[in-house]
């Protein structure tokens, strides 16, 4: 080959796949007490945790567990008990484009839980939504320039490369104690949910520091007359430092997930109660580098053999876009016909199930259904009453989401206030976390071959542009410098229209 090709080996991180799937996870446990005791399930909830994710050819294998907690009464109708159980799962998710031994980011959330009692055994079932993103880091030799004996015209493009060069992860156990109001008359703490938010990331010299807040909603059995159940809300800060293994990177990022929650109440010694909470957090940290590279987009020679290029289409990760936001909401619920009237509200639980989302400028619009469980007391019975309802929601968040982002929507600070005996106002806060990557699609030239070209005779030509032609395609067709072509047609605009006449002067050296 007479032409000389300039090449450079580029290490790039490519987003290979994105997928979503649902898994049904079931578990069972034997309840304490006698088989003849009447048992009623009041509420069933749970959380899902992904322990490992492995990438295969066009698929990913996820392993994890669902931690169930079920509130129920047994025997005495006004005594609320809890049972917790864990069910493991292994789920294969279709992930077109995924490659063996590639990196997989997976996230799980429980969208629905139901439980039933049969023969002294509690059967539990959870519907788990799984979101998966695949990525791989590859080295690719790309063309950055070309030199030819008779001269050559080159067109370049700039690509931005962001890749993870160091990572680390660790589990940290957050222990906190909270004083419970004496007026609640807490007998025992039954269960709790927790959520974690990152507020600050610092680091350097192979370390990353992650700080944030954990919010805890605890459910307690109470000795208050007519109120066997109470709910309290708490906050606690957390801080974790991770050692990063790998190269040095100046762009730091972190994720935190709640992996388990354990709560108990104990006497404080002065007649009050203290809530002891242990929250197991999984913290992941990464360090990225970002660089810009100018590569060859196209080229042609002025004379002699023509160049034919081969290349590869890639989707390159150029940045990270993660954001969180919260919006409060409320709705009025009309209890179904035949439902016992509301005397006093005990607790309310809500799970948002997002069915659609779209971005409008810097806002993300979501809609879906709220799956609601109301626990309350009625005048006609000393046992708590459970009502399950669904209501639609539409909420707009001040978040700019990247395409194919992994979006998590949760509800907390859920509170139900009776309006009348058959109407309840539900107040809640929806918290959204958007985890996405910014990408750039590019066709990268990797090699070139020479082939015989039809020579253009010297002379002065008047050509008329066809649809889709521009200055580059005309100059390439006649094998003349683009600068010479523009100089001969100084009055023509940068964007040529179909039918525009262009003067071309072809003169061999």
Pin down the residues of each PLM region.
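Membrane-lipid interaction segments
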Residues: 2-457
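Primarily a LysM-type cell-wall glycan-binding module
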Residues: 450-487, 492-509
């Amino acid at each position: 080959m007479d032409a000389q090709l300039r090449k450079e080996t580029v290490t790039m991180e490519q987003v290979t796949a994105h997928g979503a799937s649902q898994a049904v996870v079931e578990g069972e446990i034997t309840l304490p007490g006698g088989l003849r005791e009447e048992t009623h399930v009041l509420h069933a909830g749970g959380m899902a945790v992904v322990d490992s994710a492995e990438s295969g050819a066009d698929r990913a294998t996820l392993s994890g567990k669902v931690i169930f907690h079920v509130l129920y009464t047994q025997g005495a109708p006004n005594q609320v008990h809890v049972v917790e159980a864990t069910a493991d799962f292994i789920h294969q998710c279709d992930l077109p484009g995924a490659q063996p031994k590639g990196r997989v980011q997976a996230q799980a959330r429980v969208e629905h839980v139901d439980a039933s009692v049969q023969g002294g055994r509690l059967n539990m079932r959870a519907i788990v939504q799984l979101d998966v993103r695949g990525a791989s880091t590859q080295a690719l030799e790309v063309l950055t320039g070309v030199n030819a004996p008779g001269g050559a015209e080159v067109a370049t493009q700039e690509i931005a490369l962001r890749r993870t060069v160091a990572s680390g992860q660790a589990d940290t156990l957050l222990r906190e104690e909270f004083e419970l109001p004496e007026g609640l008359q807490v007998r025992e703490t039954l269960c709790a949910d927790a959520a974690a938010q990152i507020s600050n990331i610092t680091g350097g010299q192979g370390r990353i520091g992650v700080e944030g807040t954990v919010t805890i909603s605890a459910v307690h059995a109470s000795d208050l007359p007519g109120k066997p159940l109470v709910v309290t809300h708490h906050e606690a800060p957390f801080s974790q430092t991770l050692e990063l293994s790998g190269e040095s990177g100046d762009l730091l990022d972190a994720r935190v997930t709640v992996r388990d929650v354990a709560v108990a109440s104990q006497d404080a010694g002065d007649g009050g109660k203290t809530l002891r909470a242990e929250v197991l957090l999984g913290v992941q940290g990464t360090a990225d580098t970002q660089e810009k590279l100018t590569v060859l987009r196209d080229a042609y020679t002025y004379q002699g053999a023509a160049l034919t290029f081969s290349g590869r289409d890639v989707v390159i990760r150029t940045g990270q876009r993660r954001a969180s936001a919260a919006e409060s909401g409320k709705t009025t619920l009309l209890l179904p016909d035949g439902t016992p009237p509301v005397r006093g509200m005990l607790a309310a639980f809500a799970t948002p199930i997002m069915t659609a989302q779209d971005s409008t400028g810097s806002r993300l619009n979501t809609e879906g259904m709220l799956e609601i469980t109301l626990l309350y007391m009625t005048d006609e019975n000393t046992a708590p009453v459970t009502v399950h309802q669904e209501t639609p929601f539409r909420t707009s968040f001040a978040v700019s989401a990247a395409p194919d982002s992994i979006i998590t929507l949760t509800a907390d600070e859920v509170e139900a206030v009776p309006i009348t005996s058959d109407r309840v106002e539900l107040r809640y806060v929806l918290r959204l976390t958007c985890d996405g990557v910014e990408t750039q699609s590019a066709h990268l030239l990797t090699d070139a071959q020479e082939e015989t070209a039809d020579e253009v005779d010297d002379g002065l030509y008047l050509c008329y542009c066809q649809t889709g032609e521009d200055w580059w395609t005309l100059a390439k067709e006649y094998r003349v410098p683009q600068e010479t072509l523009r100089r001969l047609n100084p009055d023509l605009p940068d964007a040529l229209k179909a039918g525009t006449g262009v003067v071309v002067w072809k003169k061999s050296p």
